[in-house]
Amino acid sequence: MPRSRVNGNFIDKTSSIVANILLRIIPTTSGEKKAFTYYRDGMLAQSEGNYAEALQNYYEAMRLEIDPYDRSYILYNIGLIHTSNGEHTKALEYYFRALERNPFLPQAFNNMAVICHYRGEQAILQGDSEIAEAWFDQAAEYWKQAIALTPGNYIEAQNWLKITKRFEFE
């Protein structure tokens, strides 16, 4: 039984019912429908902190999904799980792959910037200011891309860029 049918939350049940109705009436292939079901189940498992189950669902969705735009969101969510697990190198890889398919994902740029900023802070703690600056510069580049896509968002990043003189805003 798909995961989405067993969740007890009223909102999740309602969302699942609506999604199932849409899957029946929207003209899509059976493969696309299966991919969406795995994606939806992956999101549900991820929201509950069941990362291993979420990854299994996302990998199955990736196997079935052919649309690059839809694949970008699957890859992005896989990146989120690796970020949550502290697997930053893997997370960056998945964010890059998501952006290759959909360059308009500001949240992927933001998450990449956060990882780079974190690595910069870790380099400072290890006494390597040169490496730290390189990580901070990379974080700045990713934040600039995220901000360019959604200028009203990422206010903390904008403030950090101003304070560190890495970017001037108009």
From Swiss-Prot:
Q: What does the record say about its membrane topology? A: Peripheral membrane protein
Q: Where in the cell is it found?
A: Plastid, Chloroplast thylakoid membrane
Q: Which parts are the TPR repeats?
A: 35-68, 72-105, 120-153
| Cellular compartments per GO CC | chloroplast thylakoid membrane
Q: Which InterPro entries match?
A: PSI_Ycf3_assembly, TPR-like_helical_dom_sf, TPR_rpt, Ycf3/AcsC/BcsC/TPR_MFPF
Keyword Cell membrane in annotation? no
Q: Is Plastid among the key words of this record?
A: yes
Q: Which Pfam families match?
A: TPR_1 (PF00515)
Any transmembrane segments, and where?
none
Q: What is its main location?
A: plastid
Q: Which GO terms describe its biological process?
A: photosystem I assembly
Q: Which UniProt keywords apply?
A: Chloroplast, Membrane, Photosynthesis, Plastid, Repeat, Thylakoid, TPR repeat
Function comment:
Essential for the assembly of the photosystem I (PSI) complex. May act as a chaperone-like factor to guide the assembly of the PSI subunits.
Q: Give the protein family.
A: Belongs to the Ycf3 family.
Q: What is this protein called?
A: Photosystem I assembly protein Ycf3
